[in-house]
């Protein structure tokens, strides 16, 4: 099931005490009405968009029974707009007719999470999830003899001299027009990159 979250929840009280709420399924809004009888109605346009119906009006006409379709003035950012809402049976009809992969997780979200939680608690909200802490960087410890440490120092010294040597050789080969100048420059660049990484750590 994809990541589910609440976009917002707004209560809009009318004379008949209809409650409007807006939830999010995978960042897509779903406007829901809870009427005085305790029945849920879902915005047809929102549902059709999630389920992949390109023509929401046609989808509602073809797959929904008119007894479970109603129009309500719905609060929006600009003003109240008349929108079509469908009941639970019609919502299920749209889900089973959809060929989009999101249909199954959307059905589970609505009927197994949102509606049961609202009926039980009067609201729907996500359960807080514990953030995974980043894994600490792995550290290793080694033991060296005095001779091995001396060899490491000389190896580093030779490495540093190699950088300077490659830089001089590259200039000489480039002046001669040799094709080897590019390869030498590449090795010098790799040496410098390793040096830069080590000096940062």
Curated annotation (Swiss-Prot):
Q: Which residues form the Bro-N domain?
A: 15-122
Q: Which domain of life is it from?
A: Bacteria
- This protein's name: Uncharacterized protein HI_1418
Signal peptide (residue range): none
